[in-house]
Amino acid sequence: VTGESGLFADPFYSPGSDFISMSNTWTADLIQRDLKGEDIFFRTKFYTEVNKALYDNWMPIYINQYPLWGKTQVMVAKIFWDWGAYWSINTLLFTNNGLTDLELLKKLTAGPRSILQKYGELSTNMQRLFSDWGPLDTADLTERYTDPFDLDFLKQFQEDIVEKEFNRDELIAKFEENMVILEHIAAETFRLVSNKVHGTSMELTVDPYTMSLNGEDRKSKNSKEVLRDAHIAKEMRNMWLYPYPEKVMN
């Protein structure tokens, strides 16, 4: 959980203070429980496993992604995705005291189709998409500005962590709801990129867990086909700097 045996994030965007705060939260909780005479063996082991799972799920946003700096459209899409994923899962868990709620953590991590497993797999596949797209994003897109809060779903993710509190059942329901939104964001991002690179239809049905810009054959226990969502599609126009495909949803 902490110290030399702990985990630390690459400072791609920041110095990793989020993982420091998570580590401090677990450490403080364990110390308090130990001082009260509680047996903390299982809790310590479980916190360690959750810490590693969150770390492994999050590291793909950094690994081998430095070449994407300077790729304007890729980095806009990537930063918006990274923020959305972070706010809707990681931060929401922290701000609702979920890191020390064993029952909640068990429900989020149990099984290959658990929320945390799906989240990690989806996030990793999105980072593959950004990596594959990077060398193809060569346009000089200057004098453009896009605000993340022009996208309603990012605004909602932020409001959920700043203005609201959830009990355990509400939090699980919110995670499930957010995962569906993330799946649609991932699928719509792929449609935009694939249309730009390969000229494919914007009405393409996409599996966000197995999608590949290079046509790689990928398998997933969480595989699902995602149809186009009108609201998500409309919102994502605000982050697309290239000319938008002619046939779009109204």
Which ranges hold each PLM region?
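Active-site-proximal substrate-binding core of FAD-dependent oxidoreductases
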Residues: 7, 26-99, 104
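Alpha-helical context
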Residues: 3, 7, 52, 56, ...
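Short FAD-binding loop at a beta-strand-to-alpha-helix junction that anchors the flavin cofactor
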Residues: 1-13, 17
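C-terminal lid/capping helical subdomain adjacent to the catalytic/cofactor pocket in oxidative enzymes
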Residues: 75-250
